[in-house]
Amino acid sequence: MATSNEAGSVLNRVPPLLTDLYQMAYAYWRAGRHNEPAVFELFFRDNPFGGGFSLFAGLSDCLLFLQNFSFSDDDVQYLRSVLPADTDAGFFSYLKELDCSCVSVSAVPEGSVVFARVPLLEVSGPLAVVQLLETSLLCLVNYASLVCSNAARFRLAAGPRRRLMEMGLRRAQGPDGGLTASRYTYIGGFDLTSNALAGRLYGIPVAGTMAHSYITSFSSLEEVWPQTLKPCGGGDSIDFICLVKGLLGRVCQLLGSKTNLIREGELAAFLSYAIAYPQNFLPVIDSYSVRCSGLLCFCAVALALFELQYRPLGVRLDSGDLCRQSLDVRRVFRECSKHFSVPQFESLIIVGTNSISEQSLSELNKKDNEIDVVGVGTHLVTCTRQPSLGCVYKLVEVRGRPRMKLSEDPEKSTLPGRKAVYRLLDADGHPQMDVLCLCDEAAPAAGVELQCFSLLGNSTLQCSITPAQVSSLRTQVFSCGQITLPLNSASESRERAQISLQMLNPYHKRLQEPHNYTVALSERLHSLVSDIKKGNSKGSNFLLSN
């Protein structure tokens, strides 16, 4: 279940004024249409990153936003100052009383695998109110789903064994972008974050290493203070510097390395850090030279920690050929483990970071390497391959009548009417097809052949399918101003995402040239679309948009 920290984070970031000014719905109110019952759908048109799927995220934030939607007196006063001077004063009184008590929402569960053209949210209620919600809901879903999907692709590229750490806060588009990224990359499959606030708010495991600046700030062993460390089990303090210097000589002798190439400042930094964090010692070892200094200093300090009954964690590599260096580091770990009779030494963690992208992670996975944890920042949180998911929020029904946008760009046409969404599964539980039906149609049945029309770009193709299993994809999550289901925590949504991805066929999960997943229309919905296009449907409408 979501924590109070998560709820507070959303409420502080997403007030009702987080919307486009043109959404203020004054014209609806002026025409007396503001209370007409209406239905909108939120969906995206194309799967992101050239892939075969997306993950739906942002639902919890949307529901918290809806539950607390109301304009303050200060909000209304500000709107008075920016709307035209001749705006009817009654409209501002209307805004003061506005809330979502008459709004209902059905949604796909957060963390679910979803596909293009499938309505993720159905929002129904008074026309002016549900129109006012458009920008905020899009803002909450677009980036969350995009970065969550990006994280899932990184997870697929990395494979199940390797741990992934999100460390993109300093590269993100502002603090809110960084916080959102930390949460939704965790849901998408990352294991850790470097973002301390995200750890506090969302319960995400937090990890970190050492900055290069910490190492380069030292130049001499004389700067190390304190110079002693007590054994983990208690007892008198040990001269840690003396212990490490003795071990460093033995390490260099074992490996045939030259002691005169070791950077004293790097050794001093490692000593100081180990004394401060004896249970979490994981330094970056490439500030100068991995082979000639960083790795040697680490081994000496780590062996000293083991001798005092502490358990160092490992090292981080942040430049150069990560695969080759990781193999060299692991070889040295094994030699030290055997020579110094410290079995745990050979299994110390190796973290790799260095502007990791999905492509470089896939390439890394094809080569021999000993990297246990990969840290990803820029390419993850900024979604460099695609900056936006492109979710849209479109009117599909007013006063019980279907509405359809007919566009000069066929890709921007919408599907009319209130719908139910079903996922058809094969005998192994793999999704085969998502079918959109009108809400008053009977649900597809397992073992019964279904005639439908698959969406192929801007056209449709008649097809038939006999599903082994059928599941309804959406459930009601908001009604009468209240959230109707417990909100999932980040870890609960993450678990759903993992299960949902495991169920997906491998050929839909391929990072390159995946098979297209079929989304189809029922026969009745297809007929409605055809009738409206021909102008034959009662109450049909034609909205042209460039």
UniProtKB/Swiss-Prot annotation:
Catalytic reactions on record: nicotinate + 5-phospho-alpha-D-ribose 1-diphosphate + ATP + H2O = nicotinate beta-D-ribonucleotide + ADP + phosphate + diphosphate
The enzyme's E.C. designation: 6.3.4.21
SUPFAM superfamilies, sorted: Nicotinate/Quinolinate PRTase C-terminal domain-like (SSF51690), Nicotinate/Quinolinate PRTase N-terminal domain-like (SSF54675)
Cofactor: Mg(2+); Mn(2+)
Record-listed nicotinate binding positions: Y22, T209, R316
Pathway in which the depicted protein is active: Cofactor biosynthesis; NAD(+) biosynthesis; nicotinate D-ribonucleotide from nicotinate: step 1/1
Modified residues (Phosphohistidine): H212
Keyword annotations of the record: Cytoplasm, Ligase, Magnesium, Manganese, Metal-binding, Phosphoprotein, Pyridine nucleotide biosynthesis, Transferase
Residue sites binding 5-phospho-alpha-D-ribose 1-diphosphate per the record: T378
Superkingdom of source: Eukaryota
Keyword Ligase: yes
Modification comment: Transiently phosphorylated on a His residue during the reaction cycle. Phosphorylation strongly increases the affinity for substrates and increases the rate of nicotinate D-ribonucleotide production. Dephosphorylation regenerates the low-affinity form of the enzyme, leading to product release.
Localization per Swiss-Prot or TrEMBL: Cytoplasm, Cytosol
Major subcellular location class: cytoplasm
Cofactor: binding details: Activity is highest with Mn(2+).
GO cellular component terms attached to this protein's record: cytosol
GO molecular function: metal ion binding; nicotinate phosphoribosyltransferase activity; transferase activity
GO biological process, one term: NAD biosynthetic process via the salvage pathway
Function, in words: Catalyzes the first step in the biosynthesis of NAD from nicotinic acid, the ATP-dependent synthesis of beta-nicotinate D-ribonucleotide from nicotinate and 5-phospho-D-ribose 1-phosphate. Helps prevent cellular oxidative stress via its role in NAD biosynthesis.
Family classification: Belongs to the NAPRTase family.
Name recorded for this polypeptide: Nicotinate phosphoribosyltransferase
